């Protein structure tokens, strides 16, 4: 379940966009990004590799197509899939449903269904701005029809908190810090609230993410480790 929440947070926010987007998302076809996820003890748990494989005009904006692969700490492939994001008039929009298909590990006997809103990163973001909320529903069932998982998550109180310097294995970046609250209601597994932060660097996108519980204890994080432009 923790892996699902980490992937959810990642794919909700980390999509790459073209030159027509705002300065924080001015990326290009062929760009490769590697991020490593860590547990609450800062031990590596997985590596996510993403590449911008296509970009094309659509409905007055730009569509970005992304290939992503998730590996465990031994380098074994856990999941792979393709996602997309769009940029229009400087706004970047990612469909939360991008997390569907093969991005969450599952077996052939399990059917996964994801429905949700679009996550918006407006043009000209600055400290003090409030950003639109979003919601997502994840359900999984066995081929027999038996329900396994039902998760309803809301992403609220999104705001641009501050400007901060972030050091990563891929370099040092001046970042816009965005915070939000993720409330996940999970049937049979109980509810969970996470206070999340993400750090956006100009021309790179997200370089760091942190997730904390309601008491302020770190639960997981992700950090940029490699960048190829």
What is each PLM-predicted segment?
Residues 68-100, 107:
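Hydrophobic/aromatic-rich structural module bridging two neighboring secondary-structure elements via a short loop
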Residues 1-21:
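Bacterial Sec-dependent N-terminal signal peptides
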Residues 28, 96, 100-173:
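Solvent-exposed helix/loop surface patches that form functional interfaces
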Residues 19-82, 140-229:
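Acidic, serine/threonine-rich low-complexity disordered tracts
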């Amino acid at each position: 379940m923790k892996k699902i929440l980490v992937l959810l947070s990642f794919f909700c926010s980390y999509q790459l966009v073209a030159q027509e987007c705002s300065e924080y998302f001015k990326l290009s076809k062929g760009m490769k990004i590697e991020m490593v996820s860590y547990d609450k003890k800062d031990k590596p748990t997985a590596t996510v590799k993403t590449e911008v494989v296509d970009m094309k005009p659509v409905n007055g904006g730009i569509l970005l197509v992304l290939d992503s692969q998730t590996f465990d700490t031994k380098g074994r492939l856990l999941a792979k899939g393709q996602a997309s994001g769009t940029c229009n008039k400087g706004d970047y929009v990612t469909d939360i449903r991008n997390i569907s298909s093969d991005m969450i590990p599952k077996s052939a006997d399990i059917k996964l269904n994801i429905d949700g809103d679009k996550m918006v990163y407006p043009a000209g973001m600055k400290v003090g701005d409030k950003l639109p909320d979003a919601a997502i529903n994840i359900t999984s069932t066995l081929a027999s029809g038996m329900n396994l998982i039902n998760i309803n998550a809301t992403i609220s109180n999104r705001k641009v908190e501050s400007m901060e310097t972030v050091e990563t294995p891929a370099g040092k970046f001046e970042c816009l810090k965005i915070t939000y609250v993720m409330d996940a209601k999970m049937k049979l597994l109980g509810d969970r609230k996470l206070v999340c932060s993400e750090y956006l660097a100009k021309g790179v996108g997200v370089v760091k993410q942190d997730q904390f519980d309601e008491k302020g204890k770190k639960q997981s994080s992700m950090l940029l480790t490699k960048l190829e432009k």
